């Protein structure tokens, strides 16, 4: 349990969390999320919402990197790593009970998911922050999430 007796799960579509962030900052944040019991799901995506449940599809092939591994350097896109394992296509669906979902998706404003979930009344509370409401940087989305979390 994290703060307010809530379990926290972070879903990331990319193989690495915080790619492009300074290695020291990335290591520090991932270490403290792990220490606090935050569950990290990389190579995963939210595919649906149903009656208080989030439905996530996660790639579980052997090439998927360990999201808690911070000592392995993340190379830029233009530098090939011949030793990197190829990520396969083996996936599994995970249904997780949720009290609250916070979306921070992409870098192009797209609030369709927010309004669809609101119209369907999927969950009692839903908030529209980050790139879902306006295009910005990760830092801005993180600050918006912190302000929202403090207010909840």
State where each predicted segment sits.
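A conserved FAD-binding loop/helix module that cradles the flavin
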Residues: 21-25, 119-152
């Amino acid at each position: 349990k994290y703060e307010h007796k809530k379990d926290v799960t972070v879903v990331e579509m990319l193989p690495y969390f915080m790619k492009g962030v300074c290695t020291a900052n990335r290591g520090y944040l991932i270490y403290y999320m792990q220490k606090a019991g935050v569950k990290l799901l990389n190579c995963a995506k939210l595919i649906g919402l149903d009656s208080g449940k989030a439905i996530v599809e996660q790639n579980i092939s052997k090439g998927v990197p360990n999201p808690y591994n911070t000592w392995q350097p993340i190379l830029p896109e233009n530098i090939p790593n011949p030793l990197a394992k190829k990520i396969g296509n083996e996936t599994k669906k995970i249904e997780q009970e949720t009290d609250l979902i916070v979306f921070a998706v992409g870098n192009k404003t797209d609030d369709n998911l927010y309004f669809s979930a609101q119209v369907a009344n999927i969950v009692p509370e839903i908030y529209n922050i980050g790139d879902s409401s306006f295009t910005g940087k990760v830092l801005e989305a993180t600050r918006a999430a912190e302000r929202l979390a403090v207010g909840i």
